[in-house]
């Protein structure tokens, strides 16, 4: 009986990881299309599919090797493994505009939020390319490059409250 339960859990886990793998392949195709075609519909499809993928709890530990290849996509994780930041270039071209999503665990659930300049005040705008997360007592500091006018290093702080990030 115990063997059957373990087998069912293993098969279920493999199917879930396979689902994320399939979504990653679709994201990879859309990423290339949005940068080659410069068409808004590809950007919108990519963003929508990325949010679907990130809202799946299995994505929290998935490595996304195909998307990270050739610097298309950057993923950083906090030392306590509670928070991940996904950044990618949204426009292509010489000026670098990045979009970032934060994914974190709260009470056993996966929460996904789009970051903007200075985190929430300009939600939905373009961000830095984040490369490091530093932990404090009740905060995470995100370090990234802001590349519109220069390669300035930017630090955004996320405060952790009991009910929200």
Residue ranges and their predicted role:
Residues 85, 94-134:
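Short N-terminal edge-element motif at the start of the domain
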Residues 15-17:
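Bacterial signal peptide processing site
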Residues 3-13:
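Sec-dependent N-terminal signal peptides
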Residues 26-81, 90:
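N-terminal accessory alpha/beta regions
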Residues 82-89, 138-147:
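Short beta-strand elements that form the blades of beta-propeller/WD-repeat-like
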Residues 99-106, 154-163:
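Beta-propeller blade signature
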Residues 66-85, 125-137:
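Structural signature of eukaryotic scaffold interfaces centered on beta-propeller domains
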Residues 122-136, 144-147, 154, 165:
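Short aromatic loop motif centered on NTY/YTY
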């Amino acid at each position: 009986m115990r063997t059957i339960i373990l087998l069912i859990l293993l098969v279920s886990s493999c199917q879930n990881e396979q689902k994320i793998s399939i979504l990653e392949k679709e994201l990879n195709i859309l990423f290339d299309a949005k940068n080659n075609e410069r068409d808004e519909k590809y950007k919108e499809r990519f963003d929508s599919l990325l949010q679907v993928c990130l809202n799946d709890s299995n994505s929290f530990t998935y490595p996304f090797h195909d998307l990270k290849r050739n610097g298309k996509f950057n993923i950083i994780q906090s030392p306590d493994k509670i928070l991940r930041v996904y950044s990618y270039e949204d426009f292509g071209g010489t000026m670098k505009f990045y979009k970032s999503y934060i994914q974190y665990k709260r009470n056993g659930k996966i929460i996904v939020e789009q970051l903007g300049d200075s985190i929430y005040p300009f939600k939905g705008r373009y961000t830095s390319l984040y490369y490091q997360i530093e932990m404090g007592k009740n905060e995470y500091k995100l370090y990234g490059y802001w590349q519109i006018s220069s390669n300035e290093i930017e630090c955004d702080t996320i405060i952790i409250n009991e009910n929200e990030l």
